[in-house]
Amino acid sequence: MKIASVDIGTNAVKSKIFETTPTSIKFIDGIRSPIRLGAEVFEEGKLSDKKLRELVSTLKRYQKKFTKDKIDQYEIIATSALRNTTNSEEARTYIENKIEHPIRIISGLEEAQLIGFHPKAQKENNKAYVDVGGGSTEIYIYNNPKHSIQSFQLGGVRIMLKKDKRKEWDRLDKWLKQFNDITEIIGLGGNIRAF
């Protein structure tokens, strides 16, 4: 079976395609389209009609590829930019109607929880997995038998545009102080790889 995921992020829309069997999953292909939703959301507060049309056009291109590649199932997830825009529900409804497919806008904590699905994340104690996105940063810490997760409104685009808040940095600092036994920090996501 072929499956795909679509991530509507702050910097880009990304898709990954996988071949699955009952016992394995194999990466086949990836697509990335730099739409930059976050710059508009963090500067103007909402997504414009023009930006929504650009997003719809991109998603329709992905859908054509999924049809051509015989993808059996795919899910579209949206993160910081779509959850932070003041017209979030209107935008989602508009997009869903145009592409005839549901979009799930996930919370920052849901994003952090997803890190825990990586096989290494639940085997290695005292390590912090940090996903620095364009609009937010999610942290997953595993310390057998429990884990801790948190999300902060501190992403690369938000910081670059000087839309980060001192209060959020203080919240991050306070949260991290409870973990004095962290031995390693592992960075995840495109913003980390870009450096």
Model region roles, listed by residue range:
Residues 11-12, 135:
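Short acidic, Gly/Ser-rich segments with clustered Asp/Glu that frequently serve as metal-coordination loops
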Residues 1-10, 16-130, 140-195:
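Nucleotide/phosphate-binding catalytic cleft detector across ATP-hydrolyzing
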